[in-house]
Regions:
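A conserved beta-strand->alpha-helix junction
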Residues: 54-64, 75-115, 202-206
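A mobile, often basic/glycine-rich helix-loop segment
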Residues: 152-177
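Short, small-residue-biased leader/transition segments that mark boundaries at the very start
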Residues: 1-7
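Structural preference for long, well-ordered alpha-helical segments in enzyme cores
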Residues: 13-18, 36, 40-45, 87, ...
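Phosphate/ATP-binding catalytic cores across multiple sugar-kinase/actin-like superfamilies
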Residues: 9-30, 134-138, 142, 235, ...
Length: 379
């Protein structure tokens, strides 16, 4: 009975949150990746539009050359192309697939840095900026599925406890990835590590739990506490910065405080029923989505797998390193940089950031220093 009540209440909260966000006196659309979260919102939106005799517009995003070069990973088990197109047809929406050219994703790195006022999430930022500009040509408001994973438990660290019980945040895979590229003595790596570790332990200690929480429930609360306090806020800032820099308003119904307050107290066994992540949301939406989408494995916002992108960014970065006015050339350990280029491309942050994104971040960092006239003492 408890499970059935949770499912019913959750369904009502999500539908109400979404319908509230559909109110708009300007053209509105939804982002539709074909994943669970965006599909739930698009399905509710499409139904609401049909009630008014209208058709909802939806958008999915892909990259030039991604189909030919896609590589499966723990965080990105499949691409979005097939699912988004298929669901758009199933929902009978006015669906548009936007494809980002490789050169545009690289070219937008500078604008993405300006939009954030600091180096950010590399092409994960620049591609969203490009897509938002394209969407703005037809629509003024969009709805996106952010915040669901942080609340319902969509990330691996929710159901893999070993990712939580270590010295730093579970989405940081290599805390030294950027520091080791700098000249020896410029920064103290141990000091930086101690800061990250101290902050992480402080947040762990600040998580609200109950004395009678089971181990799994306590783990669920900690993962939610960390994800909403850090990971979600980072994604929301990214969304706000890139969209508003494009004069596009993007709304996030899953960020409704009522949803977080309710789901935070739902037993983990209900949220992870049958060892399925976000089982509560899936069960609540069984008659809203087809099986193909309802049980699709989580896949994050897409990144480019096209090797031409890494080469493009590397060429751009080398030009900046060759410039006499760049900061990065003065602080970079060139031997460490060459070793990084010769090594395998491993994920060092989040779900998507590997070597191409590290190169793009370095480019953003150097551009940021130029844009805001940053100076370093004693270099």
């Amino acid at each position: 009975v408890g499970s059935e009540m949770c499912i019913r209440d959750r369904r009502e909260l999500v539908e109400d949150a979404m319908r509230r966000q559909l109110v708009s006196d300007v053209p509105l659309c939804t982002f539709l990746s074909g994943g669970l979260d965006s599909s739930v919102l698009s399905a509710i939106g499409a139904a609401a539009y049909r009630e008014q005799g209208e058709t909802l517009s939806t958008y999915s995003f892909e990259y030039e050359g991604n189909r030919e070069n896609f590589h499966q990973s723990l965080f990105q088990p499949q691409g979005d192309d097939e699912y988004a197109r298929w669901l758009g047809q199933w929902l009978k929406t006015d669906h548009t697939v936007l494809t980002a050219p490789t050169e545009e994703v690289a070219r937008c790195l500078e604008a993405a840095t300006a939009a954030r006022d600091m180096p950010g999430q590399a092409d994960v930022d620049s591609s969203l900026l490009y897509f938002c500009r394209r969407v703005k040509a037809r629509h003024t408001v969009a709805i996106s599925g952010e915040c669901s994973d942080e609340i319902f438990g969509g990330y691996p660290w929710f159901y893999r406890p070993e990712m939580l019980y270590r010295d730093f945040f579970p989405w940081i895979h290599d805390p030294y990835a950027r520091i080791r590229l700098l000249k020896h003595g410029l920064l103290d790596p141990d000091e930086g590590y101690a800061y990250i570790s101290g902050l992480y332990k402080k947040w762990l200690a600040g998580c609200d739990t109950l004395e009678d929480d089971s181990d799994s429930m306590r783990q669920s609360r900690i993962a939610t506490h960390l994800s909403t306090g850090f990971f979600m806020t980072s994604l929301l800032e990214r969304k706000d910065r890139m969209s508003m820099y494009s004069s596009l308003e993007v709304r996030v119904p899953f960020a409704d405080h009522r949803i977080l307050e309710y789901v935070y107290n739902v037993p983990w066994e209900i949220k992870f029923e049958n060892q399925v992540e976000k089982a509560l949301l899936r069960n609540a939406m069984q008659d809203v989505l087809p099986e193909k989408i309802l049980h699709r494995k989580k896949s994050p916002y897409p990144k480019t797998h096209n090797p031409a992108y890494e080469q493009e960014v590397l060429d751009m970065l080398r030009r900046r390193l060759a410039s006499p006015c760049g900061i990065l050339a003065q602080i970079m350990d060139t031997e460490a940089f060459d070793r990084m280029l010769a090594s395998d491309s491993e994920t060092w942050f989040g779900q998507l950031m590997s070597r191409p994104q590290l190169l793009a971040w370095l480019y953003q960092f150097d551009y940021f220093c130029e844009l805001y006239k940053v100076e370093f003492e004693d270099i």
